Amino acid sequence: MSGVGEKASGTTKTPADFLKSIRGKPVVVKLNSGVDYRGILTCLDGYMNIAMEQTEEYVNGQLKNTYGDAFVRGNNVLYISTTKGTLSDGA
């Protein structure tokens, strides 16, 4: 067999596990419109509705606005990604 589907490390991480692990951490939320929101993920529900703090809005890679709190409706979300030093976290 090719080993497809076998566990490499003995544990399987699901998308739900990933989403739980990034709560309270810096994330990038990309919308279907192409706009990026970068901030701290505070809340996420089963419909992918998102609440963020310390949020920055980027349009075409340019910072357009900053918000204390931001709420994004789940049907607008293309993806959620963790960030690596993109916020002012000292990285």
Swiss-Prot record:
Expression by tissue: Expressed in roots, leaves, stems, flowers and siliques.
Q: Where in the cell is it found?
A: Cytoplasm; Nucleus
According to the UniProt record, one GO cellular component term is: Lsm1-7-Pat1 complex
Q: List the disulfide bonds.
A: none
Which UniProt keyword terms apply here? Cytoplasm, mRNA processing, mRNA splicing, Nucleus, Ribonucleoprotein, RNA-binding, Spliceosome
Molecular function (GO) terms for this protein are:
mRNA binding
How would you summarize the oligomeric state and partners of this protein? Component of the heptameric LSM1-LSM7 complex that forms a seven-membered ring structure with a donut shape. The LSM subunits are arranged in the order LSM1, LSM2, LSM3, LSM6, LSM5, LSM7 and LSM4. Component of the heptameric LSM2-LSM8 complex that forms a seven-membered ring structure with a donut shape. The LSM subunits are arranged in the order LSM8, LSM2, LSM3, LSM6, LSM5, LSM7 and LSM4. LSM6B subunit interacts only with its two neighboring subunits, LSM3A or LSM3B and LSM5.
Q: What name does the UniProt record give this protein?
A: Sm-like protein LSM36B
Organism from which the protein derives: Arabidopsis thaliana (Mouse-ear cress)
Question: Upper taxonomic classification of the species?
Answer: Eukaryota, Viridiplantae, Streptophyta, Embryophyta, Tracheophyta
